[in-house]
Amino acid sequence: KLPALFAQMRENIDPARVPKTHAETVARQNSGVISLVEQFIEPNAGLLQGDDRKRLDAAIEGLRKAVAEHQLWLDKTLVPNAKGDFRIGQKLYDEKLEYALMSSLSRDEIKQRAEAEVVRVRGEMYKISRQVLTGKANAPELPDSPNDAQQQKAIEAALELAYADKPKRDAVVDTAKQTLAQATEFARQKDLVTVPDDPVEIILMPEFQRGVAVAYCDSPGPLDKGLKTYYAISPIPDDWTDKQTDSFLREYNTRMIHLLSIHEAMPGHYLEGAHSARHPSTLRGVLRSGMFAEGWAVYTETVM
């Protein structure tokens, strides 16, 4: 059915309406469909014999051809002709915002709240910066009442200390595993919330889903009993230069990976998803609130 799906996609899509960045992303993701076959299906193909094995081999070969044909269309037709604008415009955005938030808060009100929060958070960042920089050689000025430039310089100097504590290129997933174990143990020790026994596994993000987010949490639905939750981490692309890799690891340093594990897994999305799936109402479990899920995950960052 996948070859037919690809063909229908090509028929339905008007390249001129597709935003360039969307086209480029899907063109990079497409080959990841084959990696799923190579990782999960082909290693187990030996379990089939006779006609069953022949049908599987034929299906895999048909899929390879379909993916290659679709890749050619993506590279030669979609990407070069993608002229769309990802912006949906003020009117549609305001309608979408109200439905998404289930609130009458306007964009201006949200912006005002956000700007006030930026001021508050930067004040906290400066306070912490003074604590970690006081007494250090070459520390910037750290007055009680800094001007904007002094505040910025102090925050940047403190962040450099965090950037320096970063995992190696091939150790991001292992670091995530360690931070997940630490966050889980902390939540239990502090009795913050009931920690579910549902299995959770950290995996490399499937290739066909890379290029959008660094990580995500894939929880089983309320009808999928006993299945694992996957906390997926996108690996650093093989073709990245040392400069690109260092820039990425400076941002996703050890402290940031701690925060990532809290948000995506414990006690963030993984925990919320596990409790949501247990709700007595199947309908409520199926119709989860994305706004609540993200709000909860961000809230737990502060709690932890």
Where are these regions (language model features)?
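N-terminal maturation segment of proteins
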Residues: 1-304
